[in-house]
């Protein structure tokens, strides 16, 4: 997760009670607390997220690190820590709270048999906050400083585990806010791709929604990008959220006079009508939905400005 607005918008993990076969799924979460050595091996793997890094990503993640991408992976592994009893007790309590709501609402959520939890300094992601890979969640080593946010935090991150590992679930969730999933990834010009700022929780650029821009309906993909090369400092200083118009038939970004067209979200008059107003974490549909999911699984649904998003989500999870 690129969590620049976080503590208020995140989280999930839960505890389950039943043992199941390795390939089975569970409606609730069974947390597995990884030891430092095992966690380090996972963070040292070059997965799809790392392989897809842009030039900007590589430059911004390897400041002061020798060896390029491989040096970064070694650095990431070195950031892992062992869980202590107080932390595991807190996460188990949060898990049980979330699982109780799942059962009360009779939700059917295709969680993996267990959700692995890794403790890290998160320096590998610029101290941004929590994020996910595969079926594991990487949590910051300072959870005990703000225990009141942990349940939301875990529920938010668990959503990313679900969408990454269940295409049908992802498609169903994205449709709640009007996003469609394309049969293949969108093709962007290299000049824009190399300025993308990657989010570990966003699987791929293959979704779009229709927005009204300058009075015209346009099919657009949301992207996080920089307008300039990396020149030092936190990558959050460079972060921009854009809407790139696409041709949904060819799955290609639309260019004008040889340049990629990128609109700001403020140019879409119906942006918040589409995304809802339950969260300010609007950098990607994945994050908007994850925040709404965390609200649903923590029971924090009273008085929301866009209750219809939560209602549709609950119905879709049954």
Where are these regions (language model features)?
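C-terminal motif of bacterial Sec signal peptides marking the signal peptidase cleavage site
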Residues: 10-11
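Active-site scaffold of zinc-dependent metalloenzymes
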Residues: 120-155, 164
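Auxiliary, metal-adjacent structural segments of Zn-dependent hydrolase domains
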Residues: 73-134
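Sec-dependent signal peptide recognition
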Residues: 1-3
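Soluble non-cytosolic domains of exported or imported proteins
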Residues: 81, 85-93, 145-153, 280-288
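Catalytic Zn2+-binding segment of zinc metalloproteases
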Residues: 158-175
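N-terminal mature-domain "stem" immediately C-terminal to a signal peptide or N-terminal signal-anchor/transmembrane
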Residues: 19-89
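Metalloprotease/metallohydrolase-associated module, dominated by Zn2+-dependent proteases
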Residues: 175-318
């Amino acid at each position: 997760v690129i969590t620049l607005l976080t503590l208020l918008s995140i989280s999930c993990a839960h505890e389950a009670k039943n043992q199941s076969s390795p390939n089975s799924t569970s409606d609730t979460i069974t947390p597995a607390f990884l030891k430092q050595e095992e966690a380090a091996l996972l963070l040292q793997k070059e997965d799809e997220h790392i392989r897809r890094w842009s030039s900007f990503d590589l430059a911004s993640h390897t400041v002061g690190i020798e060896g390029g991408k491989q040096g970064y992976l070694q650095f990431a592994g070195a950031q892992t820590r062992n869980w202590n009893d107080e932390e595991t007790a807190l996460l188990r309590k949060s898990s049980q709270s979330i699982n109780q709501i799942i059962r009360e609402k009779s939700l059917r959520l295709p969680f993996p048999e267990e959700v692995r939890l890794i403790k890290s300094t998160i320096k590998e992601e610029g101290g941004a906050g929590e994020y996910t890979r595969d079926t594991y969640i990487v949590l910051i080593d300072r959870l005990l400083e703000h225990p009141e946010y942990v349940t939301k935090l875990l529920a938010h991150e668990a959503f990313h585990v679900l969408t990454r590992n269940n295409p049908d679930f992802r498609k169903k969730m994205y449709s709640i806010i009007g996003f469609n999933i394309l049969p293949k990834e969108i093709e962007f010009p290299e000049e824009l791709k190399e300025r993308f700022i990657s989010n570990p929780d966003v699987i791929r650029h293959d979704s779009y929604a229709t927005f009204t821009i300058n009075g015209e309906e346009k099919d657009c993909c949301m992207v996080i990008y920089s307008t300039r090369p990396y020149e030092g400092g936190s990558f959050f200083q460079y972060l921009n959220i854009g809407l790139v118009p696409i041709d949904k038939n060819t799955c290609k970004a639309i260019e004008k006079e040889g340049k990629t067209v990128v609109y700001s979200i403020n140019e879409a008059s119906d942006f918040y009508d589409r995304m809802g107003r339950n969260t300010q974490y609007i950098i990607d549909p994945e994050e908007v939905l994850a925040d709404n999911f965390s609200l649903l699984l923590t029971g924090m649904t009273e008085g929301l400005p866009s209750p219809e998003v939560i209602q549709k989500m609950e119905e879709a999870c049954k």
